[in-house]
Amino acid sequence: MDIFNPDHDLCLANGSASFVPPATARQFGQDCSAIMEYVLPDVSPHKVWGWDRIVLGRLLKSGADPSQLPSEAYLDTVRELSHRRYALSCREYVFSKIGNPGFLCDIAPYEAMTMDSIISTVNEYADALLKAPWSGSGKGIRKVRPDSWTASDRGWCAKMLDRQGSVMVERRQKVALDFSLQFRMTADRLLFEGFAIFETQGCAYNANLLASNGHILGLLSAYSETKDILRVRDLVGEYLETAFLGRYRGVLGVDMFFSEEGLLAPCIEINVRNNMGMVSRLVYDRLASEYTGGFCTGASGASGASGASGAGASVCAGTSGRSGAGLSAGFPDGQLKMRVLNASSPEQLRSSLAGARTILAGGGPDALHAVAIF
């Protein structure tokens, strides 16, 4: 049994095994369940988007063998590792290892434990982002300035302090390009699976570029020297091996960005679950394999990989007829995007899908969500 549970981040933030995710999130999971075709198994033969107590309960109720499911202790570890302080720690590790970090963007993330420390840090940064310790996909984020505090902002901070124990505060930067590093943790080592470039709308995920690792690295190298990008990648891999090896198995997506000044901001967020960046890698690799005579990109597509960031296994399984529909021979490198669409009605969704090359998931007669290639 495979489960696409895009409400995973909400379940972690709530922390209760009895939490009921919003109906919109549940419908997204139902509409786009076919996206699990592009997800790799991890600690269980049952593939899930992200492990939490809610999805464990769903599997047990469906009759899954408990011996083939992760323990509650493991799920507690996943929740711990998903806290934003691990991204903060990863950033500190990268900065400490690079002698002259002139190419890095310092967003100076700080974990504030009191309202006074939140306010003083926002006053220091002048333009800041407030983030809930457990949140993702654009949720749990607020933009604030010292002169624009509202009662709603203060109430939100008080709620986060009460429910999650802290609030993450960081300098707000103007972003030129969002990207991520995609890793996969096995029982005994970390594999670097590739790069992903993504787009957001209002802090929420919107789309991924479908491109080879070589093409993406070329785009990233327009902002910073290739050797510096690969150095950061290797240091992030070192940190993940130290903090996650033996504690977690599965996909790890580390979000980063280049600022408008061309500086690299590492370790903005660590997604301790599957994510659309890894899906875009597998989608591109699979379609490129089918449409270019067997050539398959993968971790080795990024030159200079070594150690923890060495070559991982490329995924070149055959695509279904649906996935390949409408795509001509010679899959284009860096010219198409994988996009998530949300609509208020099935008719609106069908209209939005009119220009799609192919639909990877969703888009049924009553669906409000879809993942498609444009």
Segments (PLM) and residue ranges:
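Conserved N-proximal alpha/beta basic substrate-recognition cap immediately N-terminal to
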Residues: 12, 25-120, 136
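ATP-grasp fold ATP-binding core
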Residues: 105-108, 122-143, 160-175, 254, ...
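Glycine-rich phosphate-binding loop of ATP-grasp-fold ATP-dependent ligases
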Residues: 106-109, 128-154, 179-180, 202-221
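Phosphate-binding site of ATP-dependent enzymes
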Residues: 126, 151-207, 257-266
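A long amphipathic alpha-helix within ATP-dependent nucleotide-binding catalytic cores
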Residues: 162-166, 204-262, 326-354
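ATP-dependent carboxylate/phosphate-activation module, predominantly the ATP-grasp catalytic core
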Residues: 183-238, 271-293
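C-terminal structural cap/anchor segments
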Residues: 248-301, 324-338
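Peripheral (often C-terminal) accessory segments that flank ATP-dependent C-N-forming ligase machineries
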Residues: 289-301, 315-374
